[in-house]
Amino acid sequence: MYISEISADNEEYDLWADWILHRRNAGSLEFKQRIMAEVERYADRVLDAAQLQPGMTLVDVGCGDGFLGLRGIKRAGPTLRVIFTDISARLLKTAEEKCIRENVREQCTFFIASAENLSAIADQSVDVVATRSALAYVHNKPAALSEFWRVLKPGAKISFAEPVFQDEALAVGALRAVIESNPKTAHNNLINLIYRLKSAQFPSDKDQMEHASFCNFSERDLLRMVQEAGFHEAHLELHIDVYRSLINSWDEFIGRSPHPLAPSPQQVMEQSFSVDEQKLFESVIRPAVESKTILDNERIVYLTATKHA
């Protein structure tokens, strides 16, 4: 029950904008501030690896609300040119409004474009192509990497920070196998509810995984695709962090989606759980959330590579 399926009857619905502007932080300003502190950390690692210099041109692919590109301008100064691209017109408008407020609009260009088609950008015209949580959701990653290669000058760099969700999907599949193979587990209502929630947010079998762009690849797959696109001097770091959840309240827990294509727990509960099931789920999970003992984990790939001169 991915968001794209839920909203299929609403042509005006923009799931990417809705996630970045609302569902990512459950509509909570305080939660958003905690999340953005983490986003800043990711963005700085991407920009550190990109080795931005004044006078360069940076392409922020899948720019969202423009955070990465604007961060680049703050670091490299008034001579950095940034090209913002996204498939969401609403997010591009949000990014442009931010640039206007920061008085840097003249340094910026905005294109509605997918990562696989950057035809608005000339061959060998940019110094850095950067992404943060964008390439992971691209269906044809080799085509996107080919476009990155095309627009980069000789000697220029790609720099990414991308989530790897494959293990989350495998965990859902493992939970499904346990339920199907163990009669006692199959009659455990709480385990079944957790499975139904997680399987609405992540694929639960091999076929679903293969067709889900955001979790059908590993860090090694991404490195291989970068090399096959012609890039050299590749460096990949997989960061796996387990930490106390940033979620501080029940409203934040049920309102937050773990990624743009996932429904929130509240959406799953309202559409798939009975009233009694909702009460059971909340009675067990809410105390753990409010005691702030819930642990989260993340797997982020940081990858840089160079187009040879």
What is each stretch, according to the model?
Residues 1-53, 67-75, 91-94, 98, 159-196, ...:
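Conserved class I S-adenosyl-L-methionine
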Residues 57-61, 65-118:
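Class I SAM-dependent methyltransferase SAM/SAH-binding core
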Residues 2-30, 34, 233-291:
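C-terminal helical/coil "lid" or tail adjacent to the Rossmann-like core of SAM-dependent
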